[in-house]
Amino acid sequence: MEIPVDQTEREDITSEKMAQINPLPVHLGPWKITVYDQENFQGKRMEFTSSCANIMECGFDNIRSLKVECGAWIGYEHTSFCGQQFVLERGEYPRWDAWSGSNAYHIERLMSFRPICSANHIESKLVIFEKENFIGRQRELCDDYPSLQAMGWGNNEVGSMKVQCGAWVCYQYPGYRGYQYILESDHHGGEYKHWREWGSHAQTFQIQSIRRIQQ
């Protein structure tokens, strides 16, 4: 004998079955960034909760200030996620030099951006290797290192890297200066076997400081 089920119970059962059939994606966010076409949060503004490959398609000629309200993001110098990379963590960036930090290079353009889905400041693990293709001396990192040489790495280059957990930003010089390279556990399978895979702007093996990206 079938036991009667009211409409509310039927909906609950259906929802539960659907959740089992279609599990939620691993990366749900939330992410939120607000960009402005003038410095100091003036001018035209637009909010985003997902990637933007070309800000010009939204009527902007450039991004000159921004606010990150949720999540961590990567900003790119050029459209289609190319050029120099800038890690954008929660906070306010009134001018281009706020996101380029102590970068030795004067770059005022920010034309595309996307969320960093794998950022996890608490659980982050990175293995660096002396040579490309994961060969040679290696070192496991689980913390922030303003100077790899002071940590005992011994030289100013890293040949290849494996991101086992989280997301990391590597810098060309000590003290988190110079070119930024964002490495993620959900890109390239977390494996970066050569500097050419660090980003379209990468030109050298030189990395001298590394830190975890905060979500």
From Swiss-Prot:
**Lineage of the source organism?**
Eukaryota, Metazoa, Chordata, Craniata, Vertebrata
What is the role of this chain?
Answer: Crystallins are the dominant structural components of the vertebrate eye lens.
How is the quaternary structure described?
Answer: Homo/heterodimer, or complexes of higher-order. The structure of beta-crystallin oligomers seems to be stabilized through interactions between the N-terminal arms.
Keywords on this record?
Eye lens protein, Repeat
Region Connecting peptide: which residues?
Answer: 118-123
**What organism is this sequence from?**
Aquarana catesbeiana (American bullfrog)
Query: What does the UniProt entry state concerning the protein's domains?
Result: Has a two-domain beta-structure, folded into four very similar Greek key motifs.
This protein is called what?
Beta-crystallin A3-1
Example of a GO MF term: structural constituent of eye lens
